[in-house]
Amino acid sequence: MNNSIVTYETFHGSAKKIAEVISDKLNCKCINIDTPFEAEDLKEINNIILVFNFRGPYTAQLTKLYLNRVKEQLKTKNVILVGEGLFSEKEFPVVAEEIYKNNPSKTFTKFFVNGQLRMDTLFPEERVLLKKFSELTGMEIKDMGELDLNKAEEIASEIENLIDTEEFKSIKDVETSENLEEKGTKWVCSICGYTHYGDNPPEKCPLCGVPKEQFKEQ
């Protein structure tokens, strides 16, 4: 599927391993984030798959800076984010808001590959964050052992099926903020910052999955 490209961060080697599994499955190019998109021909690319390791504030900030750098290239693409490790309560809103802000009319999908985690090495405040994360996502928080490349294979297959759907095949015009605002009341997810326009909030947030009660009218 050469209408996709996989890009990964270089701070953690596990992100590269996952990216290679996905690109092999999709038969598409795999580049690291130090390779500028400007050097790639993206005209025929519909789907950009981002692979990042999430272990702390540094990688969250790295992701945000990278997404801001490539925001023009993301505007007309479907974005798939594969996170290895765990998001913290502080990290996920940073990433989700950045993607949605720059990509409001295209599809955004997220997957997780459980990575290395040792519960007995965590600080108390980190345990609190993980508990909140577990409640929000339904992911069980436990010692994870080594990088789960079998899970990466499963996700690669899910992505392969996903990008073959009509929703991902169709290229829509990017809607401006003005056009979105004409659609009604502005609702903002209090957890991840996703913005929805309409008479009512969505039943659940398409980014972080929380119920509509978490949306605030603005």
Where are these regions (language model features)?
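Short Cys/His-rich micro-motifs in 6-15 aa windows
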Residues: 208-218
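Short beta-strand/turn micro-motifs composed of small residues
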Residues: 7-8, 52, 83-85
